Amino acid sequence: MKNRGFNTHRHGDGSTVVPPAAEVHLRDTMGELPLLYAAADIAIVGGSLIEIKGIGGHNLLEPCAVATPVLFGRYISDFLEISHNIVERAAGIQVHDSNDLRDTLKKLLNDAALRNRMGANGIQVIKENRGATQRTLELCIPLIESDVLVREH
């Protein structure tokens, strides 16, 4: 990114001061993403762009929850259903290679109205998926109370 003329900052390499002119933030830490997603114009879920053994992607709902359009790659095996929902609802875009990522970023960076629509769509995705734990419990409780799930000793 520096080679392309962007002011960058990498957090997690020991530095604690964020340069005021930083345009691109690379984070390699835990617990900071929700705040950063809320401040961002676009979120790129980088862990989905490359195959990482034992990792099936990263949470695509976090950017949606703060109305930030999300871009992600193909390595999302743990989030297939929600990724399809995000794409269908136009809250995010799955990119297929570096050229696709570049072109999609250019398009979004130059179209604030599109980013705003995608952000609003992301909030809708979150609203539609609330209550998943309750729905899961409603499906599981009858099984637990029946003889279907009996531990054999």
Predicted segments with their positions:
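Nucleotide-activated sugar donor-binding and catalytic core shared by glycosyltransferases
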Residues: 1-153
